[in-house]
Design a protein with these regions (language model features):
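Conserved Walker A/P-loop ATP-binding site and its immediately adjacent core
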Residues: 59-92, 165-171
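Inter-Walker segment of RecA-like/P-loop motor cores
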Residues: 93-118
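Conserved ATPase-coupling elements of RecA-like P-loop NTPase cores
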Residues: 120-122, 132-146, 167-168
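Catalytic acidic motif of RecA-like/P-loop NTPases
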Residues: 55, 115-118, 132-136, 163
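Conserved P-loop NTPase motor "coupling/switch" region that bridges the ATPase
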Residues: 72, 126, 143-245
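Walker A/P-loop
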Residues: 45-65, 160
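Conserved helicase/translocase motor-coupling segment
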Residues: 241-291
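Conserved pre-motif I regulatory segment
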Residues: 8-51
Length: 291
């Protein structure tokens, strides 16, 4: 290997596992096998993101991750989700403590909500961000607080069902929080500040159409870096839409077809002519009168 090849190798992002090796049998037997596989992968990574579609059991996965990582764990969730997570934990025989500040933390799994993060200083062994798409804002106060407060926490897990696949800001902020790289490092490595491009199929031929650059604020992935970008993402993030993505059966996870049944409601006392859409109801009081 010559010096230049060595130079290029050293430029490559390296993300090392900092977690623990476990066996699938260490996971709670109530979990599905695909969930156990994800838990095993995440515990081994130590710092990672789990982007699973709705209904695939992110809550059970994050709870098992916290249990197997050990020590003092803090789960941060939206206000409406915290107590729901406590109830879900009871289904797999785990006890969660709802805490409001750092003085209430105990050994084991603790949970709080995002509105209370000013009461914590990051003195935990592991941190879980539930609904981690809250990191999306590039300059948001909560995003900055989360990154700064928990920068030195060894074990980190992000969970959300809705990462924007074409939103470099959200992807970069997840990588920044997890300690993979900063948002700017990701942009400089894989993206270029240029007009976004869209592929259009016209009469069987593919064309590339350039879009707006919005005053220099738009970034697009470098064409030659696409494979490396997704290879890099797979080193710290797990994406899954259904169990078959990991080779398992989708039985029990396939939704029935959606049937849309229109219901026409006659509105007494309200008539409008020469309009396409009826807009004669003004406020709640009018809507209450509709019979």
């Amino acid at each position: 290997m010559n010096d230049y090849e060595e130079f290029l190798r050293n430029k490559k992002f390296k993300f090392f596992n900092v977690g623990k090796d476990i066996d699938q049998s260490d996971c709670n037997p109530l979990l599905f096998d695909f969930q156990k596989d994800i838990v095993k992968w995440a515990v081994n990574k130590g710092r990672c993101a789990i982007f699973l579609d709705t209904g695939l059991g992110k809550t059970f996965i994050q709870l098992e991750w916290a249990r197997l990582i050990g020590g003092t764990c803090l789960i941060i969730a939206p206000l409406s989700v915290a107590r729901q997570t406590i109830k879900e934990a009871e289904k797999i025989d785990l006890e969660l403590k709802l805490v409001h500040d750092e003085s209430q933390l105990k050994q084991g799994i603790n949970i709080t909500n995002y509105e209370l993060i000013d009461n914590f200083n990051g003195n935990v062994d592991s941190i879980v961000l539930d609904e981690s798409s809250i990191l999306k804002s590039i300059s948001g106060k909560i995003k900055r607080k989360l990154i700064d407060t928990f920068a030195n926490v060894k074990y980190k897990l992000c969970c959300t069902a809705t990462p924007a696949p074409n939103d470099y800001i959200e992807i970069g902020n997840h990588a920044h929080f997890l300690g993979v790289c900063t948002h700017q490092e990701m942009l400089s490595m894989f993206f270029i500040n240029a007009n976004k491009e869209h592929t259009i199929d016209f009469n069987g031929k593919l064309y590339i159409k350039k879009g707006s650059n919005k005053g220099g604020q738009e970034w697009r992935i470098k064409h030659h870096a696409e494979d490396k970008f997704f290879e890099w993402m797979s080193s710290w993030a797990m994406f899954m839409m259904k169990p078959s993505d990991l080779g398992y059966s989708d039985d029990g996870f396939e939704l029935p077809p959606l049937n849309i049944i229109p219901i026409v409601k006659e509105i007494n006392g309200y008539h409008q002519d020469d309009v396409l859409f009826f807009d004669g109801l003004s406020g709640i009081s009018d809507r209450v009168k509709v019979s």
